[in-house]
């Protein structure tokens, strides 16, 4: 697992813990302890990339949450939500790659261009 992927996962688990998902603690602890052992110097650029990953995950979560709860959404609203999620996920991948580039801990992740772009 690349550092960008580990940080991405920690941001998701942190959100789950904040909303009471007790089952997320074990993986969160494992990943945060493993990251701590890397002794990575935190630069402003790295901090910024981490925050952008967390914000992208936050936005994806917010958009998908109404759908998960079964709220009434017409086809146009679902389409709009899916496009927004795709766009935020694209930004998320870019920032995970930036984390890997800055730390030299990981690999560049490539995503296939969606035909709607």
Label every model-predicted segment.
Residues 1-117:
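Anionic, Ser/Thr-rich low-complexity intrinsically disordered regions
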């Amino acid at each position: 697992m690349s550092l960008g992927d580990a940080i991405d996962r920690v941001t998701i688990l942190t959100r789950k813990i904040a909303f009471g998902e007790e089952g997320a603690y074990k993986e969160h602890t494992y990943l945060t302890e493993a990251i701590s052992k890397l002794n990575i110097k935190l630069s402003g650029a790295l901090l910024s990339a981490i925050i952008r990953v967390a914000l992208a995950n936050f936005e994806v979560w917010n958009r998908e949450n109404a759908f998960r709860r079964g709220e009434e959404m017409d086809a146009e609203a679902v389409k709009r939500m899916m496009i927004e999620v795709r766009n935020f996920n694209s930004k998320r991948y870019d920032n995970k790659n930036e984390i890997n580039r800055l730390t030299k801990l990981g690999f560049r992740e490539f995503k296939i261009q969606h035909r709607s772009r």
